[in-house]
Amino acid sequence: MTVLGVTALTISTYCGYLYASYRREVTKAQSLDVPQDVSDRYNRTAPNFDAEVEMSEKVMRMGKKRQDLVRKARGDVLEVSCGTGRNLEYYDLGERRGHDEDGRAVIRGCRSVTFVDLSPQMIEVARNKFGKLHPDFKKVTFRAQDAKDVVPPSAGAKPTYYDTIVQTMGLCSMPDPVGTLRHLGSITEPHKGQILLLEHGRSYYDWLNKILDNLAPAHADRHGCWWNRDIGEIVRQSGLEIVEEKRWHFGTTWKYVLRPVSGSQDAKQ
């Protein structure tokens, strides 16, 4: 047998093995009865979460994408689904005045930051990490809480809002992602406030979506994440205004800059 023949046989055998393994995993995944709310899985995975995702995030250059997104945060900031705090190192902490490219006065940096996650175990990891990264920044709060229940701190009779809301890789684990986004829009400053999202979900390509769909129950059961959600449709149904949208990795990684629709309407009046 020629070298070419041996190579072809080896490749075909390996591909056959991969396909057989994939079919077994699909059969196993489809047999699972997994609820839509799988957020409790993070209580179990919290201690090892960073180690489990570190390599894949490096390969996908997610650190740079997180940094580019989080550096936009300013004013009073809320991060929901903060997990173990994989965004902590990217925050520009400490509010100060500056100017944009057109010379207009702007506020830069974060006056305060509130971190929220449904998992107490995840919050504890994030709290410890923040203390090591930013020991001198005191205007920070950590809460184990559902994002749909978050309200800004009271300021008497005057309505209060967050200037920036950040969420990365959170819509995949929420039982009601549309309702959560709508709530976040209601507590975002209506004129200049912003909601910053970095999410993963469905692809541009049907063949990849089929793989995601077939393996989704097993992935959700193990990792607490429905990786086949249509992020674009969730955002559309939320009613928030899309300021910026980008996608990478065959369309499975989604970035959004959003704002409340009422803010853009008021600004025009």
Regions flagged by a language model, labelled:
Residues 148-165:
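A short acidic, Gly/Pro-enriched loop at the edge of an enzyme's catalytic core
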Residues 13-74, 86-90, 211-217:
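Conserved class I S-adenosyl-L-methionine
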